[in-house]
Regions:
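Bacterial N-terminal signal peptides that target proteins for export
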Residues: 2-16
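Hydrophobic helical h-region of N-terminal Sec-dependent signal peptides
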Residues: 18-22
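C-terminal motif of bacterial Sec signal peptides marking the signal peptidase cleavage site
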Residues: 24-28
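Buried hydrophobic residues that stabilize the cores of well-folded domains
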Residues: 32-301
């Protein structure tokens, strides 16, 4: 007889988001039937997202057994992100195990407070438009990290994240990401973590762009430190607006002989909403082409 057992483990949230033109939206709070309401400051000035749920699911292969990872972002009736739940499911023997963590989002006057199950509290200070200018994140042990954010503002007064800078307890700058929007079809991304530097270009095809009406960030952005620490804020549009188009290719500057390129292929439903993204990392090693693939399925409603 097959047994199902659920195991809940408290884990520190670390994200999965973003070609910086691609973010989804922070939204205003009001009553709904799911208990997702939080106080709403200045609802007319804050960005919103037009969905109640954005969920990502993928199967991650491992040497032991495949793991199904699910990331669920819930929005209230006014379109503001209220919670994130991350879950990993796997079968060992005849037993089903689930590792789950939940992160909540609370809105106050010019603030968004994000708290995970490990009691890490990230407090974002918001400007009058609802976008974060600073963040202070403190874990249960009392360790503190601070972040500053700057944006490109377009002619429609929309904000797109241009820079995130992280400082540690001692005030030392530890990491940053800078996005250059000079060419919206070829975003230049500069990343530095401690002494490591990495530059890349995120592109979308000229004349064959895919409209990002799904308002989702590109997969690589929320994998990229320090933005990986802010995936909930990214999906809540606390860190900026979505792009008009989906990124389809990421090319590192340092690919050299490896010719490394990541290609993103999207499947859309009849509304034009993304239902899946297939990512292929292709590079040359010892004269042979090697591929790493991942497929993420989306439920957006």
């Amino acid at each position: 007889m097959k047994l199902n057992r659920r195991v809940t483990i408290i884990t520190r949230f670390s994200g999965i988001m973003f070609s910086l033109l691609l973010l989804g939206g922070l939204a205003a709070c009001s009553d709904d039937n799911n208990g997702n309401d939080t106080p709403e400051p200045e609802p007319s000035t804050y960005p919103t997202t037009p969905f109640s749920k954005i969920e990502l699911k993928e199967v991650i292969e491992s040497d032991a057994q495949p793991v199904t990872a699910t990331h669920t972002y819930l929005y209230n009736s006014a379109g503001r992100l209220t919670s994130y739940t991350g879950k990993q499911s796997f079968t060992a023997g005849d037993e089903l195990f689930e590792i789950e963590n939940t992160t909540t989002v609370e809105y106050k006057d010019h603030q968004a407070v994000i708290t995970d199950e490990a009691s890490t509290v990230s407090t974002y200070t918001l400007n009058d438009k609802g976008y974060a200018t600073t963040c202070t994140s403190q874990d249960m042990a009392g360790n503190t990290r601070t972040y500053t954010f700057s944006y490109l503002i377009n002619t429609e007064d929309k904000y797109y994240l241009e820079n995130i800078t992280e400082k540690l307890d001692d005030g030392k700058e530890y990491s940053f990401i800078t996005i250059d929007y000079s060419n919206f079809r070829a975003l230049r991304i500069q990343q530095k973590v401690d002494t490591f530097e990495h530059n890349s270009t995120a592109t979308t095809p000229s004349g064959n762009e895919i409209a990002n009406i799904s308002e989702i960030p590109s997969l690589f952005i929320t994998d990229m430190y320090p933005l990986s620490m802010h995936a909930v804020a990214i999906y809540g549009k606390i860190l900026g607006e979505p792009a008009n188009y989906l990124i389809t290719q990421l090319i590192p500057d340092s690919n050299g002989e490896s010719e490394e390129t990541t290609t993103y292929t999207y499947t859309l439903d009849n509304r034009g909403i993304v239902t899946s993204c297939h990512a292929v990392v292709r590079h040359i090693r010892n004269g042979y082409e090697q591929d790493y693939t991942r497929t993420v399925n989306y439920t957006i409603e």
